[in-house]
Amino acid sequence: MRLVLLGPPGAGKGTQAQRLVARHGIVQLSTGDMLRAAVAAGTPVGLKAKAVMDAGGLVSDEIVIGIIAERLDSPDAKNGFILDGFPRTVAQAEALDQLLASKGLKLDAVIELVVDQEKLVNRILNRAAEAQAKGEAVRKDDDPVVFKTRLEAYNRDTAVVAPYYKARGQLKQIDGMAPIDQVTAAIDGVLAEAA
């Protein structure tokens, strides 16, 4: 099972990815985690990434795809994976398609968690208020200013990825505003259809 989960920050992608990993024995591939691991391991692609990051630059799509290619060859990724934080642009989606094709693979599903962004902002504000009321630290991502900045970046840069997959007939949309268990059940339904 090879999946991409799409949706804005706060839509519940991380929660659903954790549930999919636990139920299906697949791995969650976070580009940020993979980048750090490749740098730490000193792989050829990791060394390229380190040079760029040390110079204060953004890691290119080519390097990120190289890191994903290395990671897909790992034994634990053979049963499948969920991509988290990738692709973020149409160019990355196209590069991912080419990478998978070169390995004789394809995505089984691209699932978008569709949310009402105004209600989503309220959800995040409530989550932050609940954490404060319990005396817990508020997640940096839940700071209203930070969250709105992330949402604007998503709308500007990443929202175009869903139409890319829709045009290819790969996109399945799920109501991300539903209760968590209902979202999980809807994802399971999509995966059953794809199997």
UniProtKB/Swiss-Prot annotation:
Residues 30-59 are annotated as: NMP. HAMAP family: Adenylate_kinase_Adk (MF_00235). Gene3D superfamilies: P-loop containing nucleotide triphosphate hydrolases (3.40.50.300). Pfam families: ADK (PF00406). It is found in: Cytoplasm. GO terms for molecular function: adenylate kinase activity; ATP binding. AMP binds at residues 31, 36, 57-59, 85-88, 92, 150. Belongs to the adenylate kinase family. It comes from the Bacteria. Its EC number is 2.7.4.3. Consists of three domains, a large central CORE domain and two small peripheral domains, NMPbind and LID, which undergo movements during catalysis. The LID domain closes over the site of phosphoryl transfer upon ATP binding. Assembling and dissambling the active center during each catalytic cycle provides an effective means to prevent ATP hydrolysis. Its main location: cytoplasm. PROSITE patterns: ADENYLATE_KINASE. NCBIfam families: adk, PRK00279.1-3, PRK14527.1, PRK14528.1, PRK14531.1, PRK14532.1. Monomer. SUPFAM superfamilies: P-loop containing nucleoside triphosphate hydrolases. ATP binds at residues 10-15, 127, 178. It catalyses: AMP + ATP = 2 ADP. GO terms for biological process: AMP salvage. Keywords: ATP-binding, Cytoplasm, Kinase, Nucleotide biosynthesis, Nucleotide-binding, Transferase. The keyword GTP-binding does not apply. GO terms for cellular component: cytoplasm. It is an enzyme of class 2 (transferase). This is Adenylate kinase.
